Structures are given as structure tokens and as C-alpha cells.
Amino acid sequence: MPRQARLDSPGTLHHVMVRGIEKRPIVNDETDRKDFVRRLGALAEETQTPIYAWALMSNHVHILLCSGALGLAKFMRRLLTGYAVSYNLRHRRHGHVFQNRYKSIVCDGDNYFTELVRYIHLNPLRVELVKDLKELENYPYCGHGTILGTPARQWQDCESVLAQFGTRTSEGRLPTVRTKIVRSLVENYGVAVAEIARQVGISTSGVLKILTRTLSI
């Protein structure tokens, strides 16, 4: 179960949420988005901080990570400060880009881990940044596509996520992860089977077969 973060020790699983100041956008265009993702990846590699899931939205960002030796506070400070300086210079503005304090929840339990991965990676679909699951699989500002194998990002820890979803092989990525996503959409978000069939590009009977599989949620 989640609880409010009181720890900043290495090896702690955190769901981090950062919002723009006064709910304003934190990215204005593709250059901003690419810059934020580049900084996240470079810092994750430099500090050996595992990133399991992430989604960059218009006015906030979700990151599921395991704090490394640097600790969460210093990691987030470097990420947000570096990006804010670059953002302000590029857009010729001054002042805060993010709310003063990011929100962090310490997470326990394998079941909650997989649900968080689904929740975070479904955000672009939920707010209609993408129109369907096919677009989500190719959306470059969310970690979902990387888990499925495209695009490859060395800094995103896909193997740990795939292990929780029940596979480690490249061949097993798409059917296993897609199955879990489809079940999550039906059971947690009430999306109609016919609509999921349209989004995924398979038949209604195919969706129903997915829903009757004995994979754990």
C-alpha cells in the first residue's frame, strides 16, 4: 500500500508527481519535451537510478523510480532545476516553472507496482494526448512504448517491469503487457469491449479471450 514518503534512502520505490506552478504548462513544444526526457534519461544513467515508468504531460509529470545513491531529493532537484533554467532561457522568462514541492509516495508491494505502471502509462490516453492504444504504443513522451520495445531507452528499467508482468523475452512483451492493459481498462476504467477492440485493432472476440486468460492482475 502507498504511504506518504518519509524516507530518502537508496533502494526506496517512489511514485513522484510534479506539477507546473499554478497548474501552468511545463512544456510548450517538442523541443521542451525532448529536453525534459533527455535530462531525465541522462540523470538516471549518471546516478544509476532505475526508472520503471514515466509520463510527461502538458502541466505535470509522473515518474516511478527507485532512489539511487544520490537520494530522491537531490535527484529531483537536479532534474527540475536544470530543466527550469533551460526552459526559462529558451522562452525568455523568469520565475518558477514547477510548484515548490514535488509530491512523492513510497510504494510497497508487487501488485501495487504493476498497477502504478499501468496507471502512469495510461495517462496520455486518459487525457486524450493520444487517441487510442496504438498511438500510445508509439507515443515518445511516455515509457509504455519502451516497455514494448520501441523506442529503446537504455535508462528505462524494462526488465524489472516485464518480470512483474510475467515475461522477460522480447517475444512475450506485446501480448503480455497488452493483455494486462486491456484488462485494466475494462476493470478499472470501464472502457467498453468494443471500444478497446477498435483501439487495439483486434476483434471483439479477441478482447474477450484476453479478459478470460488466467494471468494475474
List PLM regions with ranges.
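Short Pro-Cys-Gly-centered "Cys-loop" motif that presents a nucleophilic cysteine in a tight turn
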Residues: 1-53, 57-58, 66-217
